[in-house]
């Protein structure tokens, strides 16, 4: 996954976003590759954070082929950064718990703080449009205020990142539930998907 991550970072043509993403991953690369994406629910395993983020980056890259009006650099930057705050929010890949900062601040605010710090160290103008929209796609990726985002998506790329985040998380949760389910039976309730059960067909059609 490390090589794949490097390839995605290199693909970011916007020089501001490229330098900022490179700086943050220079600092957090090792943790990013080892951490889970969550304590429970989706991608809650060692390396799950990188697996989830890179899955979204791959989905975004393919989606731009269908919808060229989307800004690929913004989507890829957002995909790589959106959950990077998990390396501060969570204690680690083993016996994962929430840290004090994770409980009281949360990963969305934590990564936004890191983006601001990195931008200041790089002498970027935080009031420039390119910095504001990058922060926006990261801050808005949970989609709704009640789900933890301080703002709702107001850019097409922000809405797309939110939808891809939901899609990738949902598929991983369904896959995990169905792997433990006998053919011709329903899975246990999946908490992260409104406590719904999912059916595993008896045959592969």
Located regions from the model:
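Alpha-helix initiation and N-capping motif
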Residues: 2, 17-18, 131, 157, ...
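Residues that form generic nucleotide/phosphate-binding pockets
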Residues: 4-12, 23-24, 114, 137, ...
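N-terminal intrinsically disordered, cationic/polar leader segments
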Residues: 162, 186-191, 202-205
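Glycine-rich, flexible loop/turn motifs
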Residues: 28, 41, 189, 194-195
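A structural signal for alpha-helix termini and helix-coil/disorder junctions
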Residues: 11, 27-31, 117, 121, ...
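Amphipathic, Lys/Arg-enriched alpha-helical patches that create a basic surface
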Residues: 168, 198-199
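Acidic/His-rich, divalent-metal-binding segments that scaffold phosphate/diphosphate chemistry
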Residues: 1-104, 128
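Divalent metal-dependent catalytic cores for phosphoryl transfer on phosphate-bearing substrates
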Residues: 51, 65-181
């Amino acid at each position: 996954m490390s090589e794949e991550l490097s390839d995605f970072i290199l693909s970011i043509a916007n020089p501001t976003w490229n330098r900022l993403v490179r700086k943050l991953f220079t600092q957090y690369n090792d943790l990013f590759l080892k951490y889970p994406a969550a304590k429970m629910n989706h991608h809650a395993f060692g390396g799950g954070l990188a697996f989830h983020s890179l899955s979204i980056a791959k989905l975004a890259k393919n989606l731009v082929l269908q919808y060229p009006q989307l800004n690929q650099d913004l989507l890829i930057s957002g995909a790589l950064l959106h959950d990077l705050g998990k390396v501060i929010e969570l204690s680690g890949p083993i016996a994962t718990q929430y840290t004090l900062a994770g409980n009281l601040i949360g990963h969305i605010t934590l990564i936004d703080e890191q983006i601001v710090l990195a931008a200041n160290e790089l002498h970027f103008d935080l009031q420039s449009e390119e910095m504001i929209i990058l922060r926006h796609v990261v801050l808005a990726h949970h989609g709704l205020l009640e789900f933890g985002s301080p703002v709702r998506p107001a850019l097409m790329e922000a809405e797309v990142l939110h939808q891809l985040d939901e899609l990738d998380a949902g598929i991983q949760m369904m896959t995990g539930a169905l792997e433990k389910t006998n053919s011709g039976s329903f899975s246990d309730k999946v908490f992260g998907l409104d406590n719904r059960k999912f059916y595993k067909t008896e045959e592969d059609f």
